[in-house]
């Protein structure tokens, strides 16, 4: 008897930066969990944010966290509108990328 074992790949339910299995998902979170492109954008943005916060000094880190909280409110305002959510992630990634580029500039 032989068995075929498939590698375990992250599924949309487990890949987002939040638990897609929760029963109390907001409309924006549900759209992110249900849309692979948004799910991937969420993971990329959350990972970038985590790395960036680990590289910043405390005051700057706190400011970045405040910006992230404000951005999350904007994302929530999109509700389940995939186009709005896509634009929100693109804009936030641009901001985070610019912050990274600022770190690499010589003093």
Segments and roles (model prediction):
Residues 1-8:
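Bacterial N-terminal signal peptides
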Residues 9-107:
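N-terminal alpha-helical modules
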């Amino acid at each position: 008897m032989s068995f075929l074992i498939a590698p375990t790949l992250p599924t949309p339910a487990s890949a987002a930066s939040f638990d897609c299995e929760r029963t109390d998902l907001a409309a924006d979170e549900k759209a992110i969990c249900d849309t692979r492109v948004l799910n991937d954008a969420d993971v990329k943005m959350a990972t970038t944010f985590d790395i960036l916060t680990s590289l910043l000094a405390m005051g700057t880190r706190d400011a970045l966290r405040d910006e992230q909280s404000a951005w999350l409110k904007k994302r929530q305002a999109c509700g389940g509108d995939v186009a709005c959510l896509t634009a929100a992630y693109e804009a936030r990634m641009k901001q985070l990328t610019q912050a990274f580029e600022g770190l690499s500039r010589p003093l």
